[in-house]
């Protein structure tokens, strides 16, 4: 078997605040720490922004009208969300002290908080937004304090759990791509039209063709090129909207406390704290997935830093009129597909997000990409995440019946919110924050069943089906599974 390349891991070679580096520098810089030439850095970063843009602006588009904001105020929320997503992404990728995973990890507005935020602020106007922001600040600070303890969950993520969760992340995202392919707005007259679906299919074929025909850097930005070509084709078809450019302001700094000082209500704080715990669970799973994809397995310190960046970014976000931030799983698929592992590329994407938040007219250019075009590319992106999970499960000893049963039950439970969205409609609304997340429920089921089948009542063995190959260290487990 060929020798594994040895990289100099800058993240671990840099002295930590509490002592010497954990590992000695290797022969050459790890791809995660490589910097690309400026043009490649910019275009690769722009590709990440294009992949996440719709996901960032969608929550404010939903919450703004629900709480009674005007279209102009909702547009202001969208710009603020781009700005704060950029700040959170820079915290995550570049980091400082023990904050930041220092992985190619994109942060943006969390969808998990949309339903609770609508419930908190419905028809309350500026007061509703102020209460939402106050709840996010308190919940985020609580998450920041809990991060050093929450990261201990990594020990409960051997390959059978990790692979299951990564697969669920990809499968859970695919309905988003399907919705985009149909047009994104279920109430629109052309939702699900043959035109929209055909455009999605054309974009999908273009992306796959570019990946097959191109080489080198052009192959790495096949998604971006596919989005550009798809958008150009969509113009004569008539599904590209230029209205956003005409109405956009040239400059739009997100003035702090634009909607007034944050207000603090106990019920709202409890609700958003639950959302924060859900986001932290999903971010932990995302970091484990990304760590495997980029060949830098996420250990407890990495996850602690990542969770601190998530929660700090979320605490800062309301100051600039943004919402709770968390990892964007769709960008993990982009890393898996392009093989561009540099965290500085994603940091460049964070810089672009900040620029878009400050220059609304530039943001409106990105918004030109029709959702059907984005949906066609999304099928490949999100499918790549699921494929990475399946690859991880290949090293999880599924021939041992307990592990196959764990995967079957966890995937089955995790797919409930996707296959039957109203399945939990009779449950209390506070529980729906957790139950409506297939990633969270599937993750919990996988962890509990792994403990029940592979640990309780058994003597610890390094090669047990549910334990990590090579011991109970999940990082070593993923290394063994990968080779």
Task: List the model feature ranges, each with a label.
Residues 76, 98-113, 155-163, 218-224, ...:
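Short, non-helical or kinked segments that cap or interrupt transmembrane helices
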Residues 18-19, 56-60, 64, 203-213, ...:
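Juxtamembrane interface elements at the cytosolic ends of transmembrane helices
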Residues 1-44, 242-257, 292-296, 306, ...:
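Intrinsically disordered, low-complexity non-transmembrane regions of multi-pass membrane transporters
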Residues 38, 64-102, 271-343:
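Membrane-embedded helical hairpins/re-entrant loop segments and their flanking transmembrane helices
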Residues 2-105, 112-124:
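N-terminal signal-anchor module of multipass membrane proteins
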Residues 39-56, 192-204, 222, 236-237, ...:
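Hydrophobic, membrane-embedded alpha-helices of multi-pass small-molecule transporters
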Residues 4-5, 26, 31-35, 206-209, ...:
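Hydrophobic transmembrane alpha-helices of multi-pass solute/ion transporters
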Residues 122-241, 348-463:
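Membrane-embedded alpha-helical modules
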């Amino acid at each position: 078997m060929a020798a594994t390349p040895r990289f100099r891991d800058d993240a671990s070679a840099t002295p930590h605040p509490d002592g010497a580096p954990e590992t000695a520098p290797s022969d050459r810089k790890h791809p995660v720490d490589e910097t690309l030439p400026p043009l490649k850095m910019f275009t690769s970063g722009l590709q990440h922004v294009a992949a996440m843009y719709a996901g960032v602006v969608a929550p404010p588009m939903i919450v703004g009208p629900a709480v009674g904001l005007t279209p102009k105020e909702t547009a202001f929320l969208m710009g603020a969300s781009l700005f704060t997503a950029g700040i959170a992404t820079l915290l995550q990728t570049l980091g400082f002290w023990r904050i930041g995973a220092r992985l190619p990890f994109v942060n943006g507005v969390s969808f998990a908080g949309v339903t609770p935020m609508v419930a908190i602020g419905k028809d309350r106007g500026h007061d509703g937004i102020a209460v939402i922001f106050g709840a996010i600040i308190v919940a985020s600070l609580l998450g920041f304090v809990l991060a050093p303890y929450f990261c201990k969950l990594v020990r409960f993520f051997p390959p059978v759990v990790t692979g299951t969760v990564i697969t669920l992340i990809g499968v859970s995202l695919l309905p988003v791509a399907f919705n985009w392919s149909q047009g994104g707005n279920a109430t629109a007259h052309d939702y699900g039209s043959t035109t929209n679906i055909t455009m999605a299919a054309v974009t999908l074929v273009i992306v796959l063709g570019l990946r097959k025909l191109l080489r080198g850097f052009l192959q790495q930005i096949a998604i971006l090129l596919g989005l550009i070509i798809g958008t150009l084709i969509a113009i004569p078809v008539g599904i590209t909207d230029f209205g956003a450019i005409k109405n956009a302001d040239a400059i739009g700094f997100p003035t702090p406390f634009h909607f007034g000082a944050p207000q603090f209500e106990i019920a709202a704080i409890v609700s958003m704290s639950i959302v924060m715990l859900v986001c932290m669970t999903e971010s932990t799973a995302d970091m484990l997935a990304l760590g495997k994809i980029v060949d830098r397995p996420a250990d407890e310190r990495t996850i602690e830093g990542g969770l601190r960046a998530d929660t700090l970014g979320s605490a800062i976000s309301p100051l600039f009129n943004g919402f709770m931030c968390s990892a964007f799983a769709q960008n993990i698929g982009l890393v898996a597909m392009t093989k561009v592992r540099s965290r500085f590329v994603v940091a460049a994407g964070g810089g672009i997000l900040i620029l878009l938040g400050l220059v609304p007219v530039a943001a409106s250019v990105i918004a030109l990409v029709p959702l059907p075009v984005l949906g066609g590319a999304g099928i490949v992106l999100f499918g790549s995440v699921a494929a990475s999970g399946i690859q991880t499960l290949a090293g999880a000893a599924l021939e041992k019946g307990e592990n196959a049963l764990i995967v079957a039950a966890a995937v089955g439970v995790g797919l409930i919110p996707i296959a039957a969205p109203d399945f939990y409609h009779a449950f209390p609304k506070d529980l729906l924050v957790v139950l409506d997340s297939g990633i969270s429920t599937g993750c919990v089921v996988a962890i509990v069943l792994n403990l029940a089948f592979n640990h309780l009542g058994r003597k610890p063995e390094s090669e047990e089906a549910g334990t990590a190959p090579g011991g109970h260290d999940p990082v070593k487990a993923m290394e063994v599974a990968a080779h």
